[in-house]
Structure formats: structure tokens, C-alpha cells
């Protein structure tokens, strides 16, 4: 999960808030690698979402941090939260029952647009406060 250059970005983001991968539970919305690293189709999300829902039931997190558009849209839809334009979802805190949802950009965004660096690290600065 999050390997190569994207994995390096993930590690840097978590290290910036004094967390490591060992301290967080990470999973994917889509459980298989898609051909050509393409974006997931609606039916693929529908087929895989059962597993994510089950993981959330088992782990019972207090804070969900969806990384990227598809994970964010799925979770906001799943828990009946107001859907705002994608750009407005990033860094916004949503409350759903017993947990919080705090969407952030997908880490690969930094590889495609290095000018997002400060914003992405700033969004991560809130995570330790939200997880208390």
C-alpha cells in the first residue's frame, strides 16, 4: 500500500506529525491493482466497498482519513454527509456517528503538483489534534 514515490510521500507526511505507518491502520477502497493504474469504475467501487465497510466495523476507528477523491466521495456518500465540491472537501472535518472523517489529498498529487507541498503538510498538521 502506497509504494514507490507515492509511498515516500506518505511516509514524509506521517513523519511530519510524528507518526509512522506502524501507528495507523491503512487500507484501500479498491482491494486490487487496477490495470494501468487507472481510476476505479463505479462497479469496481461497489464490489470492493463491502470489504472497506467491514474493516471499519471491525477496527472501529475514531478518525478516518480518506486520501483522494474516490475514497472521500465513497465515505461521504456512505455515511450520508453533505457532498461539497471536491476542492472544498480537503481539510474539512466531517462528523459521522462515532467517528470523524478528515479528507486529504491523495499523496500522488504532490508528485504531479509540487506546489501543493505546503498545503498537504498543513492539512496533516491537524491529524494529531483530531486523533486525541
Where are these regions (language model features)?
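A polyanion-binding, active-site-adjacent surface
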Residues: 1-132
Amino acid at each position: 500500500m502506497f509504494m514507490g514515490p507515492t509511498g515516500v510521500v506518505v511516509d514524509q507526511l506521517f513523519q511530519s506529525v510524528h507518526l509512522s505507518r506502524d501507528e495507523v491502520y491503512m487500507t484501500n477502497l479498491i482491494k486490487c491493482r487496477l490495470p494501468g493504474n487507472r481510476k476505479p469504475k463505479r462497479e469496481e467501487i461497489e464490489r470492493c466497498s463491502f470489504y472497506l465497510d467491514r474493516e471499519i466495523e471491525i477496527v472501529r476507528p475514531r478518525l478516518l482519513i480518506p486520501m483522494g477523491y474516490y475514497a472521500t466521495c465513497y465515505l461521504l456518500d456512505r455515511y450520508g454527509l453533505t457532498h461539497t465540491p471536491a476542492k472544498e472537501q480537503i481539510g474539512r472535518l466531517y462528523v459521522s456517528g462515532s467517528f470523524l472523517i478528515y479528507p486529504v489529498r491523495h499523496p500522488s498529487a504532490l508528485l504531479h503538483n509540487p506546489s501543493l507541498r505546503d498545503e498537504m503538510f498543513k492539512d496533516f498538521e491537524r491529524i494529531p489534534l483530531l486523533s486525541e
